[in-house]
């Protein structure tokens, strides 16, 4: 995973790229193949990275999202615990497992997985953020690489106080054919109540490699004018909606569809 920022002397220009066919397909709810500009990495400088070397999660960089190391919390249809996030062979592995007696016999039977973030160690405003990953295979599994800050819950703003930036989300394994090989990129602002506002930026097919078997790269270029989303270095979508003007931290997570620790009906 690499995080970069613009050198101070660079002010990238945002150009508008429109494709009528792509717009029609998006409105129909079908994923589209990324077709925009290629990512220009020459305008960035590396500021942070984790190659997941070694044999355990680096806790100087990562902590549990909404929980501390060793704790267990309910997250939608499962439980989150850091023990399900392990490191080996130069990769982070977030497992999803069923424990009939609960994790370590804690009396909470159910599915367990994990979500980790950099909230205590690193945050950044503007730049390029990416992860290279294989998506989890399973109906009801929902992996994501996203950004967040405390201002997301604040109301009466247009994103400048903070936004949930979903660089990629992968809830589509259950779909048949090529539609299942897709991810979504979304923006959320103004909390999650009645004043919540959201923008679905793109629903993209992943075509270079099978996303459930091979690595692909999912990236975000974020600047003062907007967000540009990339898959394998090719633009998938862009928006000026809800541009955050504050530093945000990164999250890597897997969730099980459902609520209160119970999977949704039909999940298997």
Regions found by a protein language model. Give the residues of each.
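Bacterial Sec-dependent signal peptides at the C-terminal "C-region" and cleavage site
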Residues: 17-37
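GH16 jelly-roll
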Residues: 30-268
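Short intrinsically disordered, low-complexity coil segments enriched in acidic
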Residues: 2-3, 57
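Accessible peptide chain termini
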Residues: 1-2, 23
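Bacterial N-terminal signal peptides that target proteins for export
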Residues: 3-16
